[in-house]
Amino acid sequence: MFHAFTGCDTVSYFAQIGKKTAWKVWQNNNELTAAFYDLHEAPSVISEKTASALERFTVLLYDRTSEGSSVNEARKVLFTRKGRQMSTLPPTQAALKKHIERAVFQGGFCWGLATVKNQDLPSPGEWGWECPERWQPLWTDLPEAAISCQELLKCKCRSRCFNCICAKADYKCTIYCSCRGDCENS
């Protein structure tokens, strides 16, 4: 389950978080072992206790000093107090739920039942996937933050802003950018 949860060929990895970092965080988080164990044999549901342990683990992946257990709260702290770019924040709680589902499908069902001759796998659609034409990850049930919260994007340019991340994404600079929106891209 650890391998699936932290990213593999069929489950996404966490932005800028490698296996080595995840392993170190796991070594200091005993309750996580029980959570991974609960999921490794194709559970029919993901318990609240297990989901909470995985959410706490995700918070620690992005901020090892955090006392919190909510990824949404960690996102707010990392963005407002530590100046992180949105692309380096942990996933939202809704996105993490879908990530957990995909990891359980891969690790618990596909790998967990690998020695079973005739597997009876559930539909991937029940475990964080969608199939408009072919199976692909369902990232979240929420609208994409970059689209619904454009005012939260920020660049680190101090002047003209022709090549900043805001301009590249075809967004205007805002007061949250280093240029304070006082540039040629506002």
Where are these regions (language model features)?
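Non-catalytic nucleic-acid-binding/docking modules located in mid-to-C-terminal regions
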Residues: 1-186
